[in-house]
Regions:
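Conserved beta-strand -> loop -> alpha-helix junction used to position metal-binding or nucleic-acid-contacting
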Residues: 129-142
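Acidic, divalent-metal-coordinating active-site segment for phosphoryl/phosphodiester hydrolysis
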Residues: 170-183
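Generic alpha-helical structural context detector
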Residues: 140-143, 159, 180-183
């Protein structure tokens, strides 16, 4: 597993207490980076997640070899190149480990419909079973609890809420930011 973390953003104090109060077993905040916008023609190239439980936090972060060339325009967004994924495992192998990491904990993602579209499509293609856990979307949540925000993009919310977002558009950094946005939203709810 490769990790890209500049600094720890582990939940503490009231944020962690609220997450654990509402989700005693814990939650998994996740993010994907992809070669494009459609799961039917594009591929996952990075999967990351942060698991939050009463015992603490753990991380999953891995590049995925998509088996296709990564388009230049998406390299310009996330910075992930063909060379970076050349020795990485394929999506089926990574997905199996990712699902084991998540277990049956509730999942949280920013713009969850996008990430879930890829996860469900790839799981179906590889005959993997999607966990029967609820999924929460911080983008939808922010529209309810952070109505004053100029928009509900991950980077905007992070900036407005004082959440460091180093390496934006890398999956682990975005999963960490999603986790903090989720916790802050739960405190406001």
């Amino acid at each position: 597993m490769s990790e890209l973390r500049e600094e720890s953003m582990e939940l503490t104090g009231p944020e962690k207490d609220r997450v654990i109060q509402l989700f005693p077993s814990g939650v998994v905040c996740l993010d994907l980076e992809t070669t494009g916008l459609s799961p039917m023609i594009d591929s996952i190239i990075e999967i990351a997640a942060v698991k939050v439980t009463s015992e603490g936090e753990s991380h999953f972060s891995e590049l995925v070899n998509p088996g296709i060339m990564i388009p230049e325009y998406t390299i310009g967004i996330h910075g992930i190149t063909d060379e970076m994924v050349a020795e990485s495992r394929d999506v089926e192998e990574v997905m199996r480990d990712f699902l084991e990491f998540c277990g049956d904990l509730p999942m949280v993602a920013h713009n969850a419909r996008f990430d879930l579209g890829y996860l469900v499509f790839d799981m179906h293609c590889h005959e993997l079973k999607f966990p029967k856990s609820p999924v929460y979307c911080t983008c939808l949540m922010s529209r309810q609890v952070f109505k004053e925000m100029p928009n509900h993009k991950l980077a905007t919310l992070a900036e407005q809420l004082g959440i460091p977002l180093v390496n934006h558009h890398r999956a682990l950094a975005d999963a960490e930011a999603c986790k903090k946005i989720f916790a802050k939203g739960l405190l406001r709810d």
